[in-house]
Each structure stands twice: as C-alpha cells, then as structure tokens.
Amino acid sequence: MKQIYLFLWAALGVVLLSTGCSSTSAIPDGEQLYTGMKPTEYVDADKSEHATSVREELEVVLATKPNGSLFGSPTLQSPLKIGLWIWNAFSQGTTSFDKWMVKAFGTQPVLMSYANPDLHTTVGRNLLKKRGYFNGDISYSLVPQKNPKKMKLQYAVKMGQLWTIDTLGYVGFTPGQDSLISAHADEAMTRSGAPFDISTLESERQRITQLFRDNGYFYYEKGMASYLADSVSRPGTVAVNLQLLDSIDGRTLRTWTIRNINVNLRRSLFENIDTTSHGRSLRVHYNGTHSPLRRRVLSNQIKLKRGDLYSASLQEETQQ
C-alpha cells in the first residue's frame, strides 16, 4: 500500500512538472484568478477607539481569502498551491482518474467573480453609516499581475467626519417610566458627544426594556419604542429620541405585582401532575403523595415573593 501511494505521488509530481505547475491553465476565458488583496488604504482615519473598532470590522467585511491563504489572511499566500495546481492539471480531463484526482486533491480556484469587490464595497459603506461615518466611502482598484490571468485587489476607505450624538431623549413614556429612566441615567449605553452608532443605540433600547421589565412592566417589549433621529438641525451631530409607540395598550403602561406562584415539579417532560400543595402564595404541583422537594427548599430558591414588583431578571434567576 505504501508503494502504491509513493507511485501516485511520484506520478503526480511528473504531471505537475510537465504542466509547469500552472495555477491558471484551466481558468475559463473572461475570468481571472483572484490572488489576494494589497493592504487597505485608510484616508483621514483617526486613532480613536471607535475608529479602530470600525477599521477592524471593515477588514473582515472587505476580506476575501485567495487560494493558498496563510492563516486565513487575504493578503498572505503560500507559494505552494498544490490543490490549485492539481485542479488546473486535471479538471479538463474526462477520465475517471482525472475526476478522482480533482475530487481527492484538487482545490477550485477563487475567481475575481467570486471576490465580487462591488458587493464588498456596498456592505462596507453601509457599515460606515451604521457606525456614524455618514459621508464615508469605499472604492477599490484592480492590481494587474505579470500573468494577465491573475489579478489582485486593493480597497481605499475614506472615513470622513464622525457624526456624534447631540442629545438623547426619551419621549412619550409615562411619569413612572420617566422616573425610572432618570434614576438609572448613569447606566445609559450612550450619551451626548458619543459617536452615533446603531449597535450602541440598540443596546440602549435593550437596556431600557430590561429596566422596565425588572421594575414591574411585565408586558413591555423592546419593539414598543423606536428611534427618531434628526441629522439636519446641527450638521455633524444627530439629535436622537427613543419614542414610545402611540398604540400601546393600558396594561403595558402599568406595573404588575406578584400574587400567586405556581411551581410544577416533573421528573420527566410528560409526567402527569395530580397533586397540589397549597401555601399562602406558593402552590406546588407534582405527581404522587409527596413533593419531590420540600417547600422550604423551594421557597429559598424562588426569588420572587408575593407583593413584589415583577422582575424578569429574578424570574430568570429562579428558573435556572
């Protein structure tokens, strides 16, 4: 068996040498082999933490790995692209051996049509806008190689001015909700002067949702408030308001307290429950004559008590 493998590799070496180890001989007409990126150029980019974070995201968005990529890099390639050589040497063949070689050892070439720089620049521009660079732009250039069947890419990123938060307001909430927001203002995920950032604003909306649900607003959900932004009044800044929707029903706007707590104890998902043990506010449902857990143990584990404001965090902690 070892001799067979040695023979195959020796034969493969002869074939590759005879074809000049070409990486483009079987590339279709009208196509070019993508051979990686030159380092992206950044114009007028500052060294702030926010700008650095955006650059790191852009590197991921713009990257396309070529054949023989080293460590997943779009700019570094191994000089030995054996899989690509095999594909070029055998992919045009019609014999069973040709097909087996391509399937077993070949690597399909990464073509320029797959690299699709137009798509990457569009996604990159959208990212810049979401991170506060409203006037940012991305372009690319094709970098010809000695072999006309090969092509590199280079992107250029003009980040432009970073737009910041002018004011952050909360509109349409009840007096009780306004009081909660004010009491926890120091926990806000963004504030005046901070970069305009869609992901940070979404985190702030989630924080407000969690704040309400931990303070009795059982029916409140994140989608019940949305952002309105004004980027016209003061160029370079955005006035942002998180506004409660108009069509919210009354039960969402009031707080709810804990009355009775019901606990179902099952040894398996489909076990029938036929017994209920009643307490002042705790009802334990189980199968059989005795509860699998003592009431005191259950009471110590349950973080919500009768008369308390409902808290989603305490409910989750109880259920863990």
Q: Where do the language-model regions lie?
A:
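Bacterial N-terminal signal peptides that target proteins for export
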Residues: M1-L8
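C-terminal motif of bacterial Sec signal peptides marking the signal peptidase cleavage site
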Residues: L17-G20
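Interaction-mediating elements
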Residues: S22-Q320
